[in-house]
């Protein structure tokens, strides 16, 4: 049944979220595999099924309990101008990046998105200045961009998670390697799981937000000295 007009996301906000989730956004997300490249080499992630399982675990065990939860809390904080709350969330992201590659990714993508926002019509200059002063991470910068739309938190998280899934799928295609049809099947699996991950993230209070993924940290550390690699993480 079609949604009522009152329940529909305004077209402008929908397009803004699609834009933010697009792999074409110049933030460099395509250049990171987030440990998957090393998992292919060292942990036997060598098939479509295994790669899909790996990404699904990343979605539920890492993204939903960490970055998505941060964004869910940061969007309303940006909308009311609670810079201290934003700073606390940004510090948490920095503190939970367990390797140099993970931290470099969060910082580089955050800076790039903030640079994009500076040249974006309708950007809040005061918020951009506040964000720039705190060594912004990507989740916090994304929350700033999303907060300037009329979209609800849930829709913003769905966009972020799908953008992550597209980049992760592309990393799997290049690392394993796999074909385009396999990639679309993997993306379909992730898309069906994203709403559940988003609901879990929205429900998390501060003391239950976490980023404990020891094997991922080990693989990320190993990636720093991996002899042959395509990705920056």
Curated annotation (Swiss-Prot):
Assigned GO CC terms: cytoplasm
UniProt cross-references to InterPro entries, sorted A to Z: UreF, UreF_sf
Subcellular location: Cytoplasm
Domain of life: Bacteria
A Pfam family annotated for this UniProt entry: UreF
GO molecular function, one term: nickel cation binding
Annotated keywords: Chaperone, Cytoplasm, Nickel insertion
Main subcellular localisation: cytoplasm
Record text on subunit structure and interactions: UreD, UreF and UreG form a complex that acts as a GTP-hydrolysis-dependent molecular chaperone, activating the urease apoprotein by helping to assemble the nickel containing metallocenter of UreC. The UreE protein probably delivers the nickel.
The protein's role, per its UniProt record: Required for maturation of urease via the functional incorporation of the urease nickel metallocenter.
Family classification: Belongs to the UreF family.
Name of the protein: Urease accessory protein UreF
Organism: Polaromonas sp. (strain JS666 / ATCC BAA-500)
Gene that encodes it: ureF
